[in-house]
């Protein structure tokens, strides 16, 4: 279990609301890697969709109540309804974890901008009076009647900027705050400075909140970046997971690693011998031998196959044949069809499940002694791992190297296995996702084919040249 952080107590419920809105106080609750992975990916997808929707609306110069509804529907789709009991936990956990992922990423500015768009939309859906009351603890003061009368002529400029009549407003429509808090509003002439303090019209209050949020996010990400080495040592599996996140704008709903080519059910067997990581090879071989794979194994192996390009129709046929030694077609439809459809997002909440990452597979590994075959083989019985290496024909030297590497980390051992399967490869970092293993293998064999074709082409040119010389 991971603890997300320590709770900071606020002085008032209103400031709590503001801190929650701006994600200022780190929440305090227990969570596991499965929650972190799913919540982070859902928020990442939400931000991607928010960014695309914002671009569309900007191009259309649109900003209507329907647009606000579109944003609200996006949030509900990925984070759930704000009325749900788990919404606050999912919202805060996913935000803070993505901060850690983005603090030193090239997508950092995208993250800040898109989170700001999300906040702006939430503000648009909130009552302005409620928002203002939430920020009383920030030192943003309403203008007193005395100040209003004293500076009425100056404040009249802001009223004209808002296309209103001075007779329609009073002191409650204005706020003052330190001028350094809102340089953008000053630059755009939406604020005036009187005796070192900035005065704004109430309609610009939301802009002030957004600007404050952006400044705070830059500060917070810098602080996290400075502390990331310690966090990496304390939660290495978390940092490993972040490396599998797609780039902003990829449009993928889960960490995907480059494979877009479809495969057929007939391809699974030969690919298992050349390009499957050990965890998937163990499950596949067991499935072939026993015509059985427990629920967790079916999830891990099934989503892996989907990730390497096995379409839904092919997956149905693959699993039907795999279980045919012990179940009829009718029993297969009753026992397994729904779960396969569910994995492909065709049942339930239409969630298109992603391949499991290494941290998640490790967290799901059965205890030593269990006869279950799912999970990470590098953290389970060394005797069983050694026997599997022998079965695969891995020589003594390579076998010892892999077994020794398990003492360092399962990722190091998995990378050793990859290197032995793919001599003279160009892999430059540790394997941290089964689908990364597969995709790197595909790249390896693609490169070999290209070199082979280039060599054949070169030989043919030499032959033709030799004939011409004769």
Curated annotation (Swiss-Prot):
Chain's role: DNA primase is the polymerase that synthesizes small RNA primers for the Okazaki fragments made during discontinuous DNA replication.
One GO term describing the cellular component: alpha DNA polymerase:primase complex
Chain residue ranges for the region called Disordered: 449-470
Gene3D superfamilies, A to Z: 1.20.930.80
Cofactor remark: Binds 1 [4Fe-4S] cluster.
Keyword annotations of the record: 4Fe-4S, DNA replication, DNA-binding, Iron, Iron-sulfur, Metal-binding, Primosome
Keyword 4Fe-4S among record annotations: yes
Subunit architecture: Heterodimer of a small subunit and a large subunit.
Binding site for [4Fe-4S] cluster: 279, 358, 376, 414
Pfam family, one: DNA_primase_lrg
UniProt name for this protein: DNA primase large subunit
Gene name, Swiss-Prot/TrEMBL: prim2
Similarity remark: Belongs to the eukaryotic-type primase large subunit family.
A GO biological process held by the record: DNA replication initiation
UniProt cofactor(s): [4Fe-4S] cluster
An example molecular function term from Gene Ontology annotations: metal ion binding
UniProt key word Iron: yes
């Amino acid at each position: 279990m991971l603890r997300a952080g320590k709770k900071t107590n606020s002085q008032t419920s209103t400031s709590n609301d503001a801190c929650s809105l701006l994600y200022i106080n780190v929440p305090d609750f227990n969570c596991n890697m499965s929650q972190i992975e799913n919540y982070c990916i859902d928020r990442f997808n939400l931000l991607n969709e928010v960014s695309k929707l914002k671009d569309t609306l900007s191009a259309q110069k649109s900003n209507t109540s329907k647009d606000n509804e579109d944003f609200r529907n996006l949030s509900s789709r990925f984070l759930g309804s704000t009325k749900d009991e788990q919404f606050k936990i999912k919202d805060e956990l996913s935000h803070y974890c993505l901060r850690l992922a983005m603090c030193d990423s090239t997508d950092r500015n995208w993250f800040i901008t898109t989170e700001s768009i999300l906040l702006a939309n939430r503000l648009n859906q909130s009552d302005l009076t409620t928002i203002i009351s939430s920020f009383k603890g920030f030192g943003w003061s309403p203008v007193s009647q005395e100040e209003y009368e004293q500076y009425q002529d100056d404040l009249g400029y802001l009223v004209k900027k808002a296309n209103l009549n001075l007779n329609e407003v009073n002191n409650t429509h204005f706020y003052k705050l330190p001028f350094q808090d809102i340089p953008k509003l000053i630059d755009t002439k939406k604020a005036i400075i009187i005796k070192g303090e900035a005065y704004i019209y109430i309609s610009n209050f939301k802009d002030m909140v957004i600007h404050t949020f952006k400044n705070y996010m830059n500060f917070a990400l810098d602080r996290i970046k400075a502390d990331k080495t310690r966090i990496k040592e304390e939660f290495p599996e978390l940092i490993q997971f972040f490396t599998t996140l797609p780039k902003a704008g990829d449009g993928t709903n889960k960490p995907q690693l480059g494979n877009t080519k479809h495969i057929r059910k007939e391809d699974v067997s030969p690919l298992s011998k050349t390009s499957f990581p050990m965890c998937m090879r163990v499950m596949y071989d067991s499935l072939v031998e026993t015509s059985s794979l427990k629920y967790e194994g079916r999830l891990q192996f099934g989503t892996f196959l989907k990730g390497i390009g096995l379409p839904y129709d092919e997956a149905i046929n693959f699993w039907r044949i795999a279980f045919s030694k012990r179940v009829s077609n009718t029993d297969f439809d009753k026992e397994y069809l729904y779960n396969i459809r569910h994995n492909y997002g065709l049942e339930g909440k239409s969630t298109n499940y992603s391949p499991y990452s290494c941290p998640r597979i490790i967290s799901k590994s059965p205890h030593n002694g269990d006869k279950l075959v799912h999970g990470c083989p590098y953290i389970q019985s060394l005797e069983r791992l050694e026997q599997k290496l022998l079965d695969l024909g891995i020589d003594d030297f390579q076998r010892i190297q892999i077994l020794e590497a398990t003492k360092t980390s399962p990722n190091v051992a998995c990378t050793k296995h990859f290197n032995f399967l793919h001599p003279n490869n160009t892999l430059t970092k540790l394997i941290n996702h089964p689908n990364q293993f597969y995709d790197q293998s595909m790249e390896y064999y693609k490169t070999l084919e290209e070199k082979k074709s280039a060599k054949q082409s070169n030989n043919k040119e030499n032959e033709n040249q030799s004939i011409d010389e004769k």
